[in-house]
């Protein structure tokens, strides 16, 4: 089955060639992409469409949703806790196209990384400090899947 490249422009897909790139952020310098092979599609499927991989930029969460694969930082931008960890306590759920931080309850859009809904709904709004650091999006990364099934992330 031949796959086509998809140029990523903030959620817009343009089919352009033989590889497939999932939606995500646009590389800051597309001529100097730093593609790093991180997994095989078969590994992702064997893990239920979700896995955390180690990269030079830290841990990246690969999440399959409705036939698309997304790559986002596995570190919640609020306090740096994992979205998907090694224990049952840290297993962020996917709801309405968002990964939800298991610690604070913030929902991050898998496509854009933007916060959807309330920032840190599980935390109290404390006098003077509020809910901690200000709202920040979750970093996202362009991803491509080769015909061989190799998954690469532009970091």
Q: Where are the language model's segments positioned?
A:
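Short beta-strand-centered segments that line the small-molecule binding cleft or hinge
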Residues: 104
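N-terminal chloroplast transit peptides
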Residues: 1-21
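N-terminal pre-ligand scaffold of iron-sulfur
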Residues: 15-98, 109-110, 114, 122-155
């Amino acid at each position: 089955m031949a796959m086509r490249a998809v140029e990523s422009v903030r959620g817009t897909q343009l089919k352009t060639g033989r590889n497939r790139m999932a939606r995500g952020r646009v590389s800051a310098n597309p001529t100097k992409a730093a593609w790093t092979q991180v997994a095989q599609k078969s590994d992702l499927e064997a893990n239920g469409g979700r896995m955390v991989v180690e990269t030079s930029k830290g841990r990246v969460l690969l999440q399959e949703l409705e036939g698309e694969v997304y790559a986002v930082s596995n570190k919640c931008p609020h306090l740096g806790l994992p979205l998907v960890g090694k224990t049952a306590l840290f297993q962020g759920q996917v709801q309405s196209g968002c990964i939800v931080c298991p610690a604070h309850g913030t929902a991050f859009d898998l496509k854009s990384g933007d916060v959807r809904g309330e920032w840190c709904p599980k935390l109290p709004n404390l006098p003077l400090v509020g809910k901690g650091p200000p709202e920040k999006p979750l970093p996202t990364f362009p991803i491509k899947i080769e015909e061989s099934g190799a998954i690469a992330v532009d970091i």
